[in-house]
């Protein structure tokens, strides 16, 4: 019994190192505009996880494109649009956000992703919250 358990643990570790774990993950964000009365809580999905990558030792002799590493990024996504409540008539109350449908390990595409690693910004509301949002697909 112990040998079977040990082999299954080793197999799991080997597969875990060989496979990437990049998939849509639930994410809650808060959206507010200074002109509007409320903060909106939105539940969406983002791509999260890790991808297998290797750091090459001979960096001086390789072109820059060979030095890029794979990141967990969107394969398929769609945008949803919500209306922020309590906005005056002169302010556009609509906010669009991406929803991850599927993810992949690949190069970061700056057309639709923020590829710069920055310090985590707070994701808080400073105004009264509204939740249970129904998004409108565009």
From Swiss-Prot:
Residues 1-20 form the signal peptide. GO terms for molecular function: hormone activity. Its main location: secreted. Glycans are attached at residue 43. Keywords: Disulfide bond, Glycoprotein, Hormone, Secreted, Signal. The keyword Cytoplasm does not apply. The keyword Heme does not apply. Indispensable for the control of thyroid structure and metabolism. This is Thyrotropin subunit beta. The gene is TSHB.
